[in-house]
Amino acid sequence: LKCHNKVVPFLSKTCPEGKNLCYKMTLKKVPKIPIKRGCTDACPKSSLLVNVMCCKTDKCN
């Protein structure tokens, strides 16, 4: 699995074994900019300020 790992979406890396999800964290308020991307083994929970999106395909975040 390859996930974007920087705020700019064209940089990606191959996830280590066991981390089979990509995630993207974005601010819930305008501007809804991505603040963190990467690989994870479990989808982090969204919070009051941050929305989390997880997916299982290459570069989907």
From Swiss-Prot:
What is the disulfide pattern of this chain? C3-C22, C15-C39, C43-C54, C55-C60
- Keywords linked to the UniProt accession: Cardiotoxin, Cytolysis, Disulfide bond, Hemolysis, Hypotensive agent, Secreted, Toxin
The protein's predominant localisation is: secreted
Q: Which Pfam families match?
A: Toxin_cobra-type
Please provide, in alphabetical order, the Gene Ontology terms of the cellular component aspect for this entry: extracellular region
What tissues contain this protein? Expressed by the venom gland.
Q: Which GO terms describe its molecular function?
A: toxin activity
Query: Does the keyword section mention Transport?
Result: no
Which subcellular locations apply to this protein? Secreted
Q: Which domain of life is it from?
A: Eukaryota
Kindly list the biological process annotations in GO that this record carries.
killing of cells of another organism; regulation of blood pressure
Q: Which family does it belong to?
A: Belongs to the three-finger toxin family. Short-chain subfamily. Type IB cytotoxin sub-subfamily.
What is the documented function of this protein?
Answer: This protein lyses red blood cells, has cytotoxic activity and induces hypotension, but is not neurotoxic. In addition, it induces direct paralysis of the muscle fiber.
Any extra remark in the record?
Is classified as a P-type cytotoxin, since a proline residue stands at position 31 (Pro-31 in standard classification).
State the name under which the record lists this protein: Cytotoxin 2
Q: Which species is this record about?
A: Hemachatus haemachatus (Rinkhals)
